[in-house]
A protein has these predicted regions:
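Bacterial N-terminal signal peptides
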Residues: 5-16
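Cell-envelope and extracellular/periplasmic
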Residues: 20-396
């Protein structure tokens, strides 16, 4: 009897711990999906009791970033020679270029793995400055059609409408196809990213997150009535086409889909006087982004995350207040009677009046980029990434 028990014990250790299909999540969009939060801004998470637990999941006690053994990622990164960065999830899968950056992928991967409690794979395809109306335009949306105002402007400038249409056609859908190409390449060789991939069990496309929008929102040529009711209806229609086409092309008809609704600047209801001129544009665009979730075919399988809810109002106000220092510096620069030392002292005194030491610390560690990149804040993008994972879990 004893030899049989030993044999059974040995067999049990040879069975893969995870016999389910590998869950694969697709993260797609433009610069905010890339992520422009410098690694140093992670410190800000620890300054808020609500986000401190996220930092513990990201860093070890010594402050060094953890490598997450059960989360694997393949990410487009044009700053490296191969054009792709892949491996186990850690910091550094944000936008390429200067310094280590993070995007929503970090806390998304951490949170999603906690939800499913098994290894997962992330495939991230994002490029800065790309629109849905042209760059990511899905096949079923048809060709880009110039509106009457655009045609009129071409005629006024003596430009060839025929050439403009040819040029637009060349650009149309390029990044939709690149997204598919990279995704299908990874899915065809998962073991090159995740060495322990069980080919017998295969994979499951378990979720898609779309975080894009800025280039469409600011495009007054494509959306000439922007800010008025219904002015971004074309975006809603294109996004619905996008969801359908992605599901068709990836042979995943019920692929759970999260729309990350643009929210840089925070809730519109909290906009101060200086931001009111943007309120109608931001408001109408956010409505248009979320609109597909109301379609009957998407009920229960497409949801929206309003990223405005994770905007840091305190951090934003501190950044706005810092603008007064820059204005003061320009004012002092005009006074030729002051020495350099006197100007520096005047700025230091002015800063001390404007900020407490704690506020200066928050400002120092909390931001690394502009407002349209969510202030380059790991705290904001960290909460957004977690929200994406939580939202997917609810519909999958």
């Amino acid at each position: 009897m004893k030899p049989i028990c030993i044999l059974l014990s040995l067999i049990s250790f040879t069975v893969p711990l995870f016999a389910n299909p590998l869950k694969v999540y697709l993260l797609v969009g433009q610069s905010n999906m890339q992520g422009h939060a410098a690694e140093r801004t992670l410190q800000h998470l620890d300054m808020d009791p609500k986000t401190a637990p996220l930092l513990k999941a990201i860093q070890n006690a010594d402050g060094k970033a953890k490598t997450h053994q059960d989360v694997w990622i393949s990410s487009i990164d044009t700053s490296v020679e191969s054009g792709v960065k892949q491996g186990q999830l850690t910091v550094g899968y944000g936008a390429g270029g200067r310094g280590v950056k993070i995007g929503p992928e970090l806390t998304f991967g951490i949170t999603m793995q906690q939800h499913v409690d098994e290894p997962i794979l992330l495939i991230k395809t994002s490029w800065g400055g790309k629109s849905l109306n042209t760059d990511f335009r899905p096949p079923s949306a048809g060709p880009y059609v110039f509106n009457e105002k655009q045609i009129e402007n071409y005629k006024k400038r003596g430009k060839s409408l025929t050439e403009a249409r040819k040029e637009k056609a060349k650009r149309t859908g390029v990044y939709y196809r690149l997204m598919l190409k990279h995704t299908q390449k990874v899915l065809g060789s998962i073991e090159s990213v995740y060495p322990n991939y069980n080919t017998k069990e295969g994979y499951e496309l378990a979720g898609f997150v779309w975080f894009q929008g800025w280039n469409d929102m600011v495009d007054g040529s494509t959306y000439p009535m922007r800010g008025q009711p219904g002015s971004y209806d074309a975006y809603s229609k294109n996004l619905a086409h996008f969801i359908r086409d992605v599901r068709k092309d990836l042979k995943a008809p019920k692929l759970p889909f999260v729309i990350g609704v643009m929210g840089a600047g925070g809730p519109i209801a909290k906009y101060g006087p200086e931001k009111q001129r943007y309120a109608s544009i931001h408001g109408e665009f956010r409505k248009a982004m979320a609109a597909p979730i109301k379609l009957p075919e998407f009920k229960g399988n497409v949801t929206a995350v309003f990223t405005e809810n994770y905007w840091d109002e305190q951090l934003s106000e501190l950044v706005d207040r810092r603008g007064k220092i820059n204005a003061k510096r320009r004012e002092l620069a005009k006074d030729q009677s002051l020495t350099r030392e006197q100007r520096e002292k005047a700025i230091a005194d002015f800063t001390d009046k404007l900020f407490s030491k704690e506020e200066l610390k928050i400002l120092e560690v909390g931001t690394s980029n502009a407002a349209y990149h969510y202030l380059g804040s790991a705290k904001i993008l960290g909460e957004i990434g977690k929200a994406f994972a939580d939202a997917l879990t609810k519909i999958h």
